[in-house]
């Protein structure tokens, strides 16, 4: 375990917004008097009607979370209109296409026009405040316009990652009963077309079978590829936006009106619609963006995430735009046309702040230093990581090779549910330890508890909970508040349970050790084991499946599947490939199984519960200490699992 410390350097300290003394003072104020602290910082956004109530939250009983509840504001207004007078000509988005020769810049004035036109199109077709609009888009500016246009008129957006399958998209349309979809003819990733419109058509068909009718589909022309067309339902984006005015007044929204739903994986099979609201979310996204990245006006900021994930919501669109920043949006992938693409983009657009995932770092590290060295990267001032813990070796490579040992790394821990950074270094305030997310952001009160719920003091290892609310926190699971209470507040009464394990060292630094529930973290993306299991079991030859994670050198966690076949069905490599294809079709490519082991049975207790602990150990090629297997209904199953494991160290 790395305990090497990289102290804050003089040049970083000299220009930092927050130094150590200020961090300690503000942090103390934020936890001792949250009403006063957030009452002040809530004013970083503009309000049509100022709030008088700041915090009204309870983690017990029915669980209710309200911030700034009597204030009126609008997210789109805060991200665009209020900047126009002083910064209308500032670039809001730099868009870098999949093709390295194609890019464009969109100023705040232009953004205003694009968003207002799209908002007027939505209104013209009957979209009203509170209606749910599904956005299934590639990384093109229109994806951000769509989010902001919804926010402008009070519609609730549900962005679905363009890598998800039609089945996954259909399920999300049904869950929030969305009747309007915004998509694209095709996406482009690594030179390959992605059939988004075709997927949308299939998803709408799936939704219709569950009695949810999509009435309109607005289609952006990206590639000009051939697509199916339903006259009366399907509309071309470029035709519709040309017919409406370029002005649309923002709707006055209550702070607790819904802003968006974003589906994330849970430990049960059905994805959860995480609901974020208007005021608290924007205050928190903007404040974390400014202080975590030490953002100064004029900085060029690039987060490599996709808008289909929360990182894209908070740190490509809402946080940066609320701060009048220039945000780079990249359509492509890190290894196209070659493994130097990220570094070429940094030079091309003079990027100052670069925020990416450990998976990308590990894979580019494996490609060799020469791809990095051929670029200058001299504009870089700050590096960030997000999505999963970063191993110290990758951290050091990122720091030394990519950042030339002069750019601090902010290793940010947070979740879809938290809306913004929770535990993170602040560049001018926090000495860095490779692999540690370091210290809590303002207002965040982490605690470690043991399995009985006892709070652990000092250096300790335990389950990470948050003791009190913060403005960016999700408010509920869409349409299922009971599930919200059960998932997050029932394990440790009166505390928000993160689902992560964590170690706190003697300096009070936090080290995230990974999920403690049945959720996988694959390449920084969350996937429920139950989702993958139900995809496998839906195949006609599969009788039962159990899925666990195992250490993977690039993705962090790989997906290891134990599959029991129907009687009389033989396992084969061809069937393995067929099952991989089947899971990709059901969920999407991110859920592709890495290893599939056919097994006559699974280790179950006499009550029928699968003992996942044993499956995890075998998947990790570590079966010397399987613990007590005497409670198993059929202990012989374990010997078969060990003998036929797919990841023997010598086979690697």
Curated annotation (Swiss-Prot):
Modifications after synthesis and translation: Acetylated. Deacetylation by the SIR2-homolog deacetylase activates the enzyme.
Any one GO CC term of the record: cytosol
Binding positions (ATP): 387-389, 411-416, 500, 515, 526
Biological processes per GO annotation: acetyl-CoA biosynthetic process from acetate
Enzyme class per UniProt: ligase
Record EC number: 6.2.1.1
One Pfam family recorded for the sequence: ACAS_N
Modified residues (N6-acetyllysine): 609
Binding, Mg(2+): 537, 539, 542
Cofactor field: Mg(2+)
Entry keywords, A to Z: Acetylation, ATP-binding, Ligase, Magnesium, Metal-binding, Nucleotide-binding
Binding site for CoA: 189-192, 311, 335, 523, 584
InterPro entries reported in the protein's UniProt record: Ac_CoA_lig, ACAS_N, AMP-bd_C, AMP-bd_C_sf, AMP-binding_CS, AMP-dep_synth/lig_dom, ANL_N_sf
Entry GO MF terms: acetate-CoA ligase activity; AMP binding; ATP binding; metal ion binding
Catalyses which reaction(s): acetate + ATP + CoA = acetyl-CoA + AMP + diphosphate
SUPFAM superfamilies: Acetyl-CoA synthetase-like
Function summary: Catalyzes the conversion of acetate into acetyl-CoA (AcCoA), an essential intermediate at the junction of anabolic and catabolic pathways. AcsA undergoes a two-step reaction. In the first half reaction, AcsA combines acetate with ATP to form acetyl-adenylate (AcAMP) intermediate. In the second half reaction, it can then transfer the acetyl group from AcAMP to the sulfhydryl group of CoA, forming the product AcCoA.
Family to which the UniProt record says this protein belongs: Belongs to the ATP-dependent AMP-binding enzyme family.
Official protein name in the record: Acetyl-coenzyme A synthetase
Natural source organism: Rhizobium rhizogenes (strain K84 / ATCC BAA-868) (Agrobacterium radiobacter)
């Amino acid at each position: 375990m790395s305990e090497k410390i990289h102290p804050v350097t003089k040049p970083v300290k000299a220009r930092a917004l927050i130094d150590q003394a200020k961090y300690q003072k503000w942090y103390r104020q934020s936890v001792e008097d949250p009403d006063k602290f957030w009452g002040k910082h809530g004013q970083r956004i503009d309000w049509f009607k100022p709030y008088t109530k700041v915090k009204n939250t309870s983690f017990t009983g029915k669980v209710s979370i309200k911030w700034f509840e009597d204030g009126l504001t609008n997210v789109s207004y805060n991200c665009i209109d209020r900047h126009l007078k002083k910064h209308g000509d500032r670039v809001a988005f730099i868009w870098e296409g999949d093709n390295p020769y194609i890019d464009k810049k969109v100023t705040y004035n232009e953004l205003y026009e694009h968003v207002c036109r799209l908002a007027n199109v939505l209104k013209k077709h009957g979209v009203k405040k509170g209606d749910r609009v599904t956005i299934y888009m590639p990384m093109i500016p229109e994806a951000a316009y769509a989010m902001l246009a919804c926010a402008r008129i009070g519609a609730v957006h549900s962005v679905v990652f363009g890598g998800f399958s039609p089945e996954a998209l259909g399920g999300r349309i049904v869950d929030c009963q969305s009747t309007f979809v915004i998509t694209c003819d095709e996406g482009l990733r690594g030179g390959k077309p992605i059939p988004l419109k075709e997927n949308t058509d299939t998803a709408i068909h799936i939704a219709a079978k569950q009695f949810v009718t999509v009435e309109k589909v607005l289609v952006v022309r990206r590639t000009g590829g051939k697509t199916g067309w339903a006259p009366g339902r399907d509309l071309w984006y470029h035709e519709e936006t040309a017919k409406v005015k370029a002005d649309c007044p923002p709707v006055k929204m209550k702070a607790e009106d819904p802003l968006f739903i974003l589906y994330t994986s849970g430990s049960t099979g059905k994805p959860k619609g995480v609901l974020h609201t208007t005021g608290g979310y924007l205050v928190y996204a903007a404040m974390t963006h400014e202080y975590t990245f030490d953002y100064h006006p004029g900085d060029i900021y690039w987060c490599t995430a996709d808008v289909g994930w929360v990182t894209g919501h908070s740190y490509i669109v809402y946080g940066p735009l609320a701060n009048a920043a220039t945000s780079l949006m990249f359509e492509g992938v890190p290894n196209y046309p070659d493994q130097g693409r990220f570094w070429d983009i940094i030079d091309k657009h003079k990027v100052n702040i670069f925020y990416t995932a450990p998976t990308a770092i590990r894979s580019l590290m494996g490609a060799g230093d020469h791809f990095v060295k051929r670029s200058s990267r001299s504009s870089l001032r700050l590096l960030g990581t997000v999505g999963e813990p970063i191993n110290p070796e990758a951290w050091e490579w990122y720091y030394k090779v990519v950042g030339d040992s002069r750019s601090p790394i902010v290793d940010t821990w947070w979740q879809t549910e938290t809306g913004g950074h929770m535990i993170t270094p602040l560049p001018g305030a926090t000495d860095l330890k490779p692999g540690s997310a370091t210290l809590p952001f303002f207002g965040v009160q982490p605690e470690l508890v043991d399995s009985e719920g006892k709070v652990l003091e000092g250096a300790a290892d335990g389950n990470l909970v948050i003791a009190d609310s913060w403005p960016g926190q999700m408010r509920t699971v869409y349409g299922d508040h009971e599930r919200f209470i059960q998932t997050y507040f029932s394990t440790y009464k009166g505390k928000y349970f993160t689902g992560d394990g964590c170690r706190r060292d003697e300096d009070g630094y936090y080290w995230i050790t990974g999920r403690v529930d049945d959720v996988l973290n694959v390449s920084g993306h969350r996937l429920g084991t139950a989702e993958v299991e139900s995809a496998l079991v839906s195949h006609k030859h599969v009788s039962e499946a159990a899925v666990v994670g195992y250490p993977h050198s690039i993705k962090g966690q790989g997906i290891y599947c134990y599959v029991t076949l129907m009687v009389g069905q033989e396992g084969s490599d061809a069937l393995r490939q067929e099952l991989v294809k089947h899971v990709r079709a059901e969920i999407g490519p991110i859920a592709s199984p890495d290893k599939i082991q056919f097994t006559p049975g699974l280790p179950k207790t006499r009550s029928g519960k699968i003992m996942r602990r044993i499956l995890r150990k075998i998947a990790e090629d570590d079966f010397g200490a399987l613990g007590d297997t005497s409670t198993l209904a059929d202990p012989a199953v374990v010997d078969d699992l060990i003998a036929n494991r797919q990841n023997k160290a010598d086979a690697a």
